[in-house]
């Protein structure tokens, strides 16, 4: 264990078309539907996961719900990035003066293209990951 290990946290993410799981400290800390609700006019993501699923099918002209992952890969980069970032914020974390660097292991389906792999890595990095490793299902 190194001196600066307290400044790093490791998480595992299973990005699924239906649900996303995040494991932190050997526990499932996030188990949410992979769905986002967006404001149609601004494109702003207003809800993710269970809150977005509750909005699905409701008649409101300014809100649409969508699944940013198709067949286990990223179909909408910005929405998936915001969804991942929101799910990471749901992780119970220790209070600290500094935010620890995140190391992520992301599970992706086998057979994805290099472009799709790059989209997952970019999305995780934009969501705050310092290091990203991909594991094929």
What is the predicted function of each stretch?
Residues 1-137:
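Nucleotide/phosphate-binding catalytic cleft detector across ATP-hydrolyzing
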């Amino acid at each position: 264990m190194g001196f600066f290990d307290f400044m790093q946290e490791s998480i595992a993410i299973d990005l699924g078309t239906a649900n996303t799981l995040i494991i932190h400290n050997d526990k499932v800390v996030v188990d949410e539907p992979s769905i986002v609700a967006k404001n149609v006019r601004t494109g702003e993501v207003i809800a993710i996961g269970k809150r977005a699923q509750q909005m699905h099918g409701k008649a409101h002209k300014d809100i649409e719900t969508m699944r940013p992952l198709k067949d286990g890969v990223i179909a909408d980069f910005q929405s998936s990035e915001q969804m991942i970032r929101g799910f990471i914020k749901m992780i119970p974390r220790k209070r600290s003066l500094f935010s620890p660097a995140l190391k992520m292991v992301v599970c992706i389906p086998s057979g994805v293209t290099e472009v799709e792999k790059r989209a997952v890595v970019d999305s995780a990095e934009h969501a705050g990951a310092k290091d990203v490793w991909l594991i094929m299902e």
